[in-house]
Amino acid sequence: MIVLPRRLSDEVADRVRALIDEKNLEAGMKLPAERQLAMQLGVSRNSLREALAKLVSEGVLLSRRGGGTFIRWRHDTWSEQNIVQPLKTLMADDPDYSFDILEARYAIEASTAWHAAMRATPGDKEKIQLCFEATLSEDPDIASQADVRFHLAIAEASHNIVLLQTMRGFFDVLQSSVKHSRQRMYLVPPVFSQLTEQHQAVIDAIFAGDADGARKAMMAHLSFVHTTMKRFDEDQARHARITRLPGEHNEHSREKNA
């Protein structure tokens, strides 16, 4: 029997897996930039690209054009087929469906917070606290990733597999569509401050076993997030319209952004 030598990309893929385990990278976390990761592993960028493509095809990683490469959440088959793929199709047809998903999160996350307050173990609480502390990072990319992990840690603490898989499906679909807006929230000091206070209120209620308080705190938080992200999108659309206007308005906008 002839044993074919392993391809270099397969070896690099194994090293990426080992790195994920070594660094305790969790689902939803972003891998280092391609150049940095290639240097870290001591391989060429071409070999790394092939390895990453292999891991994406195996469902280990999730690649977003212009957004980077993320550790992918493990979806049950029913979740992938009935939640993730249909939502991806909707989002591809019309990105504005992201706001419909955000509205659906009200019902889902109100429940996860309620159940987490009733069922969270000491280990669950420790993970929620660590994710919250990571949202305080001065790097908006790290903070926004930690924000996702914070919400999923609460879903895990609900110990309800249907709620958890639904949440994972939502965040998988929303990963790229709201990434920029989520980062912007962490770049605006007053918004960042309110997010921190809201997250702390959710934690306090969950840790105190106050189910109704946790539900209300989560709904207030999501209402703020929805309103803020919608305002960001409207501001961006307004700016785009202004820059297309002829004459004084356009000149004024250019001077303002110069």
Curated annotation (Swiss-Prot):
<dbReference type="InterPro" id="IPR000524">
    <property type="entry name" value="Tscrpt_reg_HTH_GntR"/>
</dbReference>
<dbReference type="GO" id="GO:2000143">
    <property type="term" value="P:negative regulation of DNA-templated transcription initiation"/>
</dbReference>
<dbReference type="GO" id="GO:0006974">
    <property type="term" value="P:DNA damage response"/>
</dbReference>
<dbReference type="InterPro" id="IPR036390">
    <property type="entry name" value="WH_DNA-bd_sf"/>
</dbReference>
<dbReference type="GO" id="GO:0001217">
    <property type="term" value="F:DNA-binding transcription repressor activity"/>
</dbReference>
<dbReference type="GO" id="GO:2000144">
    <property type="term" value="P:positive regulation of DNA-templated transcription initiation"/>
</dbReference>
<dbReference type="GO" id="GO:0000987">
    <property type="term" value="F:cis-regulatory region sequence-specific DNA binding"/>
</dbReference>
<keyword id="KW-0238">DNA-binding</keyword>
<dbReference type="InterPro" id="IPR011711">
    <property type="entry name" value="GntR_C"/>
</dbReference>
<dbReference type="Pfam" id="PF00392">
    <property type="entry name" value="GntR"/>
</dbReference>
<keyword id="KW-0805">Transcription regulation</keyword>
<dbReference type="InterPro" id="IPR036388">
    <property type="entry name" value="WH-like_DNA-bd_sf"/>
</dbReference>
<dbReference type="Pfam" id="PF07729">
    <property type="entry name" value="FCD"/>
</dbReference>
<keyword id="KW-0804">Transcription</keyword>
<protein>
    <recommendedName>
        <fullName>Putative L-lactate dehydrogenase operon regulatory protein</fullName>
    </recommendedName>
</protein>
<comment type="function">
    <text>May be a regulatory protein for the LCT genes.</text>
</comment>
<dbReference type="InterPro" id="IPR008920">
    <property type="entry name" value="TF_FadR/GntR_C"/>
</dbReference>
<dbReference type="GO" id="GO:0044010">
    <property type="term" value="P:single-species biofilm formation"/>
</dbReference>
<feature type="domain" description="HTH gntR-type">
    <location>
        <begin position="6"/>
        <end position="74"/>
    </location>
</feature>
<feature type="DNA-binding region" description="H-T-H motif">
    <location>
        <begin position="34"/>
        <end position="53"/>
    </location>
</feature>
<dbReference type="GO" id="GO:0001216">
    <property type="term" value="F:DNA-binding transcription activator activity"/>
</dbReference>
